[in-house]
């Protein structure tokens, strides 16, 4: 990797912020979504076992159903996905000892890639609770997903309504060096 590409990668990592307000009318193109998903597919996984699975939801009815289920777990009536038109659900195979870490790395890659291609994203929790429920398991089965998968998280994806706030300064004791 040349120095310019490395600097751009580091810039993406330092400037990505969670977006909590999306334009629900502005759907990213399939091409942009595929670029983001490809980054998720190349996330590191324990022993290269690729335990995660991703479900890309652009269907509004399914997206709204996921929002409703998430809001129910959270105990609110508002949209936990902040109006994002695309939801990427990350699941991971519980039979792999590193499944939670694998799924978490996929989530990180998805959010960083979204920023790199000009999209906003936000990690939305409660996938575990949703997809451990009877209704969640029925959804997985209807999508052809068999096995013992745990919901790791949802990535809310789309165009931000406004620029996210600047990053807070990093805490002084974030890193300890032992030389």
Give the positions of each predicted feature:
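Acidic, surface-exposed loops and disordered segments
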Residues: 1-179
């Amino acid at each position: 990797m040349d120095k310019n590409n490395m600097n751009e990668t580091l810039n993406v990592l330092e400037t990505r912020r969670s977006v909590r307000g999306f334009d629900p009318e502005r759907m990213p193109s399939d091409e942009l979504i595929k670029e983001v998903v490809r980054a998720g597919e190349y996330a590191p996984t324990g022993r290269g076992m690729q335990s995660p699975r991703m479900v890309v939801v652009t269907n509004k009815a399914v997206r709204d159903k996921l929002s409703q289920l998430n809001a129910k777990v959270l105990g609110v009536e508002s949209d936990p996905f902040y109006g994002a038109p695309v939801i990427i659900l990350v699941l991971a195979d519980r039979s792999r000892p590193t499944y939670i870490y694998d799924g978490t790395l996929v989530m990180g890659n998805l959010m960083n890639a979204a920023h790199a291609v000009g999209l906003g994203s936000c990690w939305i929790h409660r996938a575990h609770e949703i997809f451990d429920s009877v209704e969640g398991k029925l959804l997985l089965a209807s999508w052809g997903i068999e096995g013992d998968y745990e919901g790791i998280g949802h990535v809310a994806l789309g165009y931000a309504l406004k620029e996210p706030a600047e990053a807070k300064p990093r805490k002084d004791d974030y890193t300890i060096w032992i030389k």
